């Protein structure tokens, strides 16, 4: 949405306003995984000639549609089921991405479109002209849905409730259309009545207030009635049904928690903290939680760990934990806090359009960050900001940029705001999952930049203002035009900021929101003793992909002998050098304490520093107030001072990373001091362990004394009397617990002169395992033991093979034998006494793969494949799959690649399917620039089919398939495909002649859009035969020039550039002829399209078959057209409107006979 337009407020793309919707699901069958129900939408027309109503619906089989109790005809068409039609041999990704973006837009509710088009009965036209209310009643069913609703039905004895069978709604972005017909847009708000009839042993949890629960006469079923009086988008409606155990929150009675059977004790502990999160958000936003109740539901096989919907959130059951578990506690609390932040911004306040998504994700991420700062402290908060900043910088530099606010011009691809990507960013459903994750990360970082500019106080006032307006609007029961106040837009948000703070943040928005890219600084300095000036040089790289030029203020902090000083430099167009005056003279003779930034004064040993310079260390942009990467050069002693004495954790982490390049005794000492300092933040100490191991390896020839960290570990955690025996575990001090876990893992990375792990270190780790005693500890040690196995894996080095001997148990290296025995013992113990989240199994599987890769045990995926099967715990499956993916790459195994791809198609768990594609993309068996035996035509076809039609039920999965295809084959036609024959395809059903699409040269294909051939008047050029005009009337599209769904059968439309030597002609008498000029002569052959039409009519009369109509949502051959003659209104009325979009797979559904028309394609091959 453009800003200029945005100032007028919300303009609906639909010719009606939805005010209320009823969803009634009166039958759920867990055995068959099916759902039957109806919806009723209350619609107010906003234009007098409303005669079509477009709604969203995927997978639903629609039985009957009534408008105000009159039967209504409808057309169902979903161009996303099959993006490029199957006669196409197109295999380049550019083509697919354009076609996919077009298909998604063709049914995008934000453009007023939908898969379901309902014809308003002619009897109601007068009623509509008076703008009177319409009630649209739709009966539908779902049979084994592949997306939107996920059934979990354990295969065991007993009733469904005893088995713990449950079902829940899920999906990426607006995916409600997958389980009931609706307007699946975040900007169409209405009130809701939700009814679910379930078995008496089941509980249905949904949005809003539970009004009543009514049992049937035989007491075998009950109906849950929910009312949601706050106007809400269909995309924020959710459902969970299962034999849940129920816990009313003891601190807040309006909050209810639900979990699967026998997990109630874990639920009590996990949610005991939630009321504090509520209090925090209500306090900072000075606003009550917007709904009258809140429900948390913990389910198995979750789509994502946290999914927020209006007044309820669905969580993964794996987040539940007992009081004995340390590591999971902060992670789960963070998930709960994220979900609650999204209740305010995301569910209660919704977005006006996709280009405003960044505002909601930014605000919810920002207030979640404030909660984190209060709960875990400033150090943890700053560490998190640094981590997020590093992630977004790495991603943007790798892919070329993340754009928060894509403003779409005329909708042409040449205005494509992200031409560097292999997918369109104009719609959430075309985005790579990784891109969307990074998008959310960047959004909250930009909110923090806005806070730096206007202050936190004003920031919170803006949020409060947005919530107050929305709250007032939501209580306007009969003034639905007021509800748009509950939608946030970029322009509205910026207006609010300028009203509240009086500050102009336009330059900041222009820099970080309206354009993509991060800043890359390179800094170095010299001290001019004569002038007592620090000469700082700052260069920028703004030519690499993903970078942008920064002009503006930049803070530099200089720590001198007399204290710490902040300087703000103005980064101009060309300025590189900046002179900064120094405050201190170099005076090292006076013994005086040195003041630090936080007011502390410390004694320092200044013997290491440069005698002529008063500078201790320098930091560029210490507050991370620019999205940037800084590479700064200063001497090793300055990094050592910075590590020891700078109190900011980010500065300490930067110093540790820099010291890896300076392996000297002084660096070793600085790192050891940090490890011993108990006041130092535990994450910094953990990082120092790994840096110390790297330095020790670089200094291996000059290192003296015991291996790095060994004496420190012994002193901290071992018995005084017997230093090789570890004390009984006591994890009461969490900081030392994390250090105790990390040190052995880092020590195992030590190597001697022969590049082997020192025997002393290996024996030390084996002793830690042997003497580990957790009997007196009140906390579980499962994470600690898992890290000890990781340490064993880290100690493994490549095997030295003699005469290519085959590895057997008898000739195993004795050290490796010890490691393998421990791993086997751990794995067997796990079967008897499984650890929390099976952390031990996960570490063992990773260790076995390390042994395989290093040549100690035969490389074989069989063990991993057995652990990857459905039924194992999800973390175990992912660890096993990671090993199979790695094996596929290292051993170039086509068989395992096929096994993985079969799993992507058939595994019952959506998250696992998504993860396999993700792992293959990150660790691919080959890439577009390599020759590989795995790259063949069958694989190309298989992956093409997967992304083209095999993943239409899950947006995230389809985008994952696109990512993998891009990684393996790139944007153009895969190199392993044979060159196609030159050919012309005549498509009889389409009545179009098309060049064989496989032979478009890449230069053309790369710019190709699946655009309809249009003549000057914007009408599609279609060869039409009047005799079946009444069947399918061609009409131009309502969406801008390049209509998506229209006639998208022809893969290379006539509008595309033709090969040299081919001419398309239309004669005055409108006889269409196609001329083909052979390259070796000047003669032209003509094909008369009339002949084609005659044969088309002939085929039409002979191929009419009577068949049951295919179910909308089930993929079908693209040529099928299901016709239902309508008794109420003659079909010719369908052609009445000229703006209706006409798509590829048409189902004119009604309750009469069904005819199916088969498609024939005549191919004329021409050989030059």
From Swiss-Prot:
Single Gene Ontology BP annotation: transcription initiation at RNA polymerase II promoter
- What Gene Ontology terms describe what this protein does at the molecular function level? chromatin binding; transcription cis-regulatory region binding
Q: Keywords assigned by UniProt?
A: Nucleus, Transcription, Transcription regulation
Q: Which InterPro entries match?
A: Aminopeptidase_N-like_N_sf, ARM-type_fold, Peptidase_M4/M1_CTD_sf, TAF2
The lineage's top-level taxon is Eukaryota
Give me the Gene Ontology terms describing cellular component: transcription factor TFIID complex
* Sequence ranges of Basic residues compositional bias: 1144-1161
- Subcellular compartments: Nucleus
| Family as reported in the entry's similarity comment | Belongs to the TAF2 family.
Q: How does it assemble?
A: Component of the TFIID basal transcription factor complex, composed of TATA-box-binding protein TBP, and a number of TBP-associated factors (TAFs).
Q: What does this protein do?
A: The TFIID basal transcription factor complex plays a major role in the initiation of RNA polymerase II (Pol II)-dependent transcription. TFIID recognizes and binds promoters with or without a TATA box via its subunit TBP, a TATA-box-binding protein, and promotes assembly of the pre-initiation complex (PIC). The TFIID complex consists of TBP and TBP-associated factors (TAFs).
**Name this polypeptide is given:** Transcription initiation factor TFIID subunit 2
Identify the species of origin: Gallus gallus (Chicken)
